[in-house]
Amino acid sequence: RVWLKEGIKVTNLHPDDGSAIQASNLFTDLIYYLLTDKRGGIGETLARTDADLDKLIDKDQLSETAKFLRKNKLFCNGAISQPENVRSWLSEKAPVFLCDFILSDGRFSVKPALPVTDGGDINHTGAVTIKQIFTSGNILEDSFKLDYLEAEERNLFKATVRYRVERENQLPGEATVTVRSGEGDGEVPTETFDVTDLCTSRDHAVLIGKYMVTLRKRITHTCTFSTTPYGLDLAPGDYIRVITESSPYSAVRTGTIAADGTITLATSIEDGDYKIIYYATSTDDADAEVVTIDVSNGIAQDWSDSGRGAAIFSLVETLTSENVYRVEQLTLNQENIVEISASEFPCDNGSVSLIAKDIKDRDLFDVF
């Protein structure tokens, strides 16, 4: 090993750097180098000309992300010492810098995994920008699915982050920092994150620990659904609001109605109008029907006159769920239908990211 003060000279994409060709410690500049350089990267394989390369890389987004990295001091210091699959390597390392490596509109880029201000700081006070709202009106029928994380994937933990310590003209050392949520009794397992290959700052390591702990605490599920491409203006990393309605089964809301309208239910039922789904037990017809009944003194009015006879019923209770999600992937299938995959992105009532608020709350974590 040798100690090098600076690395290779690359194009600097931060707006303040004016595309200077010089050493850099920003992950975005490394990405651009690996994707475009024809000797040290895959530029020769990716495209034949520089003009073609520019069409495959979103430099504007890289420039915006560079502001986020520098503002939060998420610096990239390390070496790629062995052959790597560039796309896999970048996807694996992006979370070290609180980012996601994305492919949007056929162009490669990297985007912060958190909402950011125009200046690049983590936005923990302003509402996230909702690009589109999805309801039963634009979600194709029977396509919406929720996938909850396994129980072991939702257990809280304390993060021990290993990072590299550099001293001029000396061999590198190693240090660790542990981050734990201040909530609870502290009796949680430890998960270790080794970022010694790229991280040389304790503050950077602490931010990684806070991010990983908060993700485990806040995110519980992902969703997938299908929609039509018409009017769709989305890309990976965008935020969407999904509003769904459901009528979950409840045993205490299920009962019987006699032919004369007398209601038998596990709990008392107040007078008023109720929407029910029922199966008539007096006929061989197994189809369910939905009707509204007027209940007075525990009797469904006009039930006996309807000729429906005795029935089993369940009160229909419609629950509305409204959540913010972060788009992970969009796929256009052969039927010209767009399939969207997104992960839960918890926000408060003002649409402010709870993950961002947690990370910026100094009193929420114990660091040692």
Which role does the model predict for each range below?
Residues 13-368:
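C-terminal extracytoplasmic interaction modules
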Residues 1-19:
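Structured beta-strand-rich cores of soluble
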